[in-house]
Regions:
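Structural secondary-structure packing elements that flank or coincide with functional cores
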Residues: 1-9, 82-129
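Short, well-ordered alpha-helical segments
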Residues: 41-45, 58-74, 88-96
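Extended amphipathic alpha-helical scaffold segments
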Residues: 22-30, 63-76, 101
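Beta-strand-dominated lipid-handling architectures at cellular/organellar boundaries
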Residues: 53
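Secondary-structure edge/capping motif, primarily at the C-terminal ends of alpha-helices
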Residues: 26-37, 56-59, 75-85, 107, ...
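Long, amphipathic alpha-helical coiled-coil segments characteristic
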Residues: 3-48
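Generic structural signal for well-ordered, non-transmembrane alpha-helical segments
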Residues: 17-20, 24, 43, 50, ...
């Protein structure tokens, strides 16, 4: 491991359960939006993603926070009806939330911190925006 990929898991260990819960709630809010087309659910989803963003920033995963920022921006645009909120956007959001969860699980399992692995997901978000 080199200095660029070395990451102290200690702080992440403390907040990982809360991050997982926030990601789960974000998924639930997104599903509720799909079922009801109630834009309030997009706000709930964005709120949970914002919680994840804050936790990631606190533990020093700045590269990953770029993904949560882009996710929040897409959700805000959908909520305010500035961006399309159809199936394609919802699919990208589902993929993003899943990729975040998997990336963090991989970190906890000992994988190095390589946020560039999330670049394809980030690009999908940017395309949706």
């Amino acid at each position: 491991m080199n200095a660029a990929t070395e990451f102290d898991l200690g702080p992440l260990t403390w907040v990982k359960g809360e991050i997982d819960l926030a990601l789960q709630r974000a998924e639930q809010a997104l599903e509720a939006y799909v079922d009801s087309a109630d834009r309030t659910q997009l706000k709930f989803c964005r709120t949970h993603v914002h919680q994840v963003h804050g936790a990631l920033a606190m533990v020093g995963l700045e590269g990953v926070t770029l993904l949560t920022e882009a996710t929040e921006a897409l959700l805000a645009g959908m909520e305010e009806d500035r961006l399309p909120s159809g199936d394609a956007a919802v699919t990208v959001l589902h993929q993003t939330l899943g990729a975040l969860r998997q990336y963090l699980d991989d970190l906890m399992a000992g994988e190095p911190n390589r946020p560039l692995l999330l670049l394809p997901v980030y690009q999908s978000l940017e395309t949706a925006r």
